[in-house]
Each structure stands twice: as structure tokens, then as C-alpha cells.
């Protein structure tokens, strides 16, 4: 064997990890300016955030959404005596652009009036799950185009806030059945609605019963343990998981308390301040959805829930693209009997998309 042509050692065949070099000795390079570039681009394009609120009528869903974003996002439509109760679940959504300190947020809120209000609630979750999957399908149809937009409009539901009635007992069979299906399709954040109707002791006991029900029935709500990326995430998310479901109170009216204006509900016993942790846990819900985990909710939606849907849909496709802008996402037809001619299976024709990514909200 030629001594000059030695076989490489196992250690040398491995890809070495890149070293971190400091530029301070050679002068300023400007790498940190990338953050400024990203900030300018993000502020120009704005952000998209889509939430869904699910729960029975009268639990304060509309008020809670308005309290979260301190805007009249949704007008409450409590059915009166002369307004007939809808016979089927109907989904409604509204889109607003909220701007704060130059940052624009395109917020879409989907409401589910009629959920759980009927005598027979069998499969009342089908329209909700169908709507969630429909948004995944829309995004997929845009994504698989050969010529597609640089910025695909995102209508996927990033978070579903599930309002639990303040019964003080445990989760109902309807809640358990629906949550088992819902948590596999979207990020779910359960909350105890109208928590001011419970005492502090009743609220804590109710929370522990709900946590036990979720664990017993293998319902994994957001933030999921399996998605903690590092030690800091584990510490923060563990504290959040200990408090879920949050006991919340919504209010969209201001009152004077000790010379200051506060959001709250006025009762004959006093004023319930929604921003006061001694009164309710609304600040924890707001911080989770907006201040600390908004981008993480979007990332998990894209990388986990949408990815699972995309894999299933692409596995159903058994044909390659046959032309520009065309993708077959229909399942393959069954094999034709011997001696007969197989008819072509149905296919969905994807339209060409126009590039309008430069448009702002």
C-alpha cells in the first residue's frame, strides 16, 4: 500500500461543525444590520394572524376578542327572544388591520355561532374541522403552482381559543370529543369563560379537573411539550401549561378606579379589572397570543399541522404534473376490470396566480 495514499480516518470523514469567528479584531463588518433589514421588511409587509373562537353562546367570545386587541373587532350578536336560534352551525369571519407604533397586523377572527347550542350536537364539529382543512387546501393549491405568488395569502387558522363553560365540574363529553379531533388539526388554547362567576377556590379546583381530563384523554393543547426547542422554552412553556386553562374575564368598557382608567366589569360588589392578575388571568392569555408566542403559533401551524395535511394530500396524488400550472391532487381511480378501458380520474385544475406580493395591507 502506498504510504502517501492512506485511507482517511473516521474522524476526518465527518463534516466538521463551522467555527464561530469574531470580526472585532479586523474591524466592523455590519452583519448585525441584517436585523434592521428584516425589521424594515417586516414592518413594510405587516403580519397576518388568524384566530378562531369556539364555544357556546353567551360565554363572552366577542367581548374577549375586543379586549385582546383593544379594538371593536367583533360586534356581539346575542340572539334575543325574537331572533330564532340557527338550526345549523354557521361560521362567520371578519378581517381588520390593526396598527400600533408603525407595526401592522392583519387580524382575521372566525366565530362559530351555534356550536353546542342544539339539543342534538352530534358531529357539530364537522363544519369547524372542514373550515380549518379548507384553509389548508387553499394554501396548498397556491403552493403547488409551478408559477406561484411570492407571498401566498395565509388564511390558515393559527390558533383556536376554546371557551369552556364555568360549570365548576369537569369537561363535558362534547368538549372531550371535539378537543380530541381539534388538537390534531390546529393549536388549541382552552380558557375558562366568565371566570368571575366562580370563587378562587372553585376556579382552581375546576382547572385541575380540566387538566386531569385533558391528560386522561390524551388531548395535547398549546404549547405542546414535544415542540419545546430549548431549555428556555421548556421553562417558559412549563409555567404556561401549569396555568392552562386560563380563567379569563372580558370587558370593553373603562371605569375609574383610584384615579386611573381600567378595563373591567362593574358589579354591585365592585369592579373586576381584566388587567389585574388578582382578579383574572386575562394578561396571561394576552401575553401568550400576542407578546410571546404569536410567531411560534404561526410556525407550528406551518411546520406541523399544515405539513401533516400536505403529506396526506400529496400521498393521495398518483400522477405527475402534466402541464404548466397543473397539479393532480385527486386520488387514483380504482383499476379497471380486465377487457375494459379505464376512464381518466378526476383532477383539479389549479389556476395561474398573479404576483401581487408588493401590495401592502
Curated annotation (Swiss-Prot):
This is Septin-12. GO terms for molecular function: GDP binding; GTP binding; GTPase activity; molecular adaptor activity; phosphatidylinositol binding. Keywords: Cell cycle, Cell division, Cell projection, Cilium, Cytoplasm, Cytoskeleton, Differentiation, Flagellum, GTP-binding, Nucleotide-binding, Spermatogenesis. Filament-forming cytoskeletal GTPase. May play a role in cytokinesis (Potential). Involved in spermatogenesis. Involved in the morphogenesis of sperm heads and the elongation of sperm tails probably implicating the association with alpha- and beta-tubulins. Forms a filamentous structure with SEPTIN7, SEPTIN6, SEPTIN2 and probably SEPTIN4 at the sperm annulus which is required for the structural integrity and motility of the sperm tail during postmeiotic differentiation. Its main location: cytoplasm. The gene is SEPTIN12. Belongs to the TRAFAC class TrmE-Era-EngA-EngB-Septin-like GTPase superfamily. Septin GTPase family. The keyword Cytoplasm applies. Pfam families: Septin. One of its GO terms (biological process) is cytoskeleton-dependent cytokinesis. Residues 257-361 are annotated as: Self-association (via N-terminus) to polymerize octameric septin 12-7-6-2/4-2/4-6-7-12 filaments.
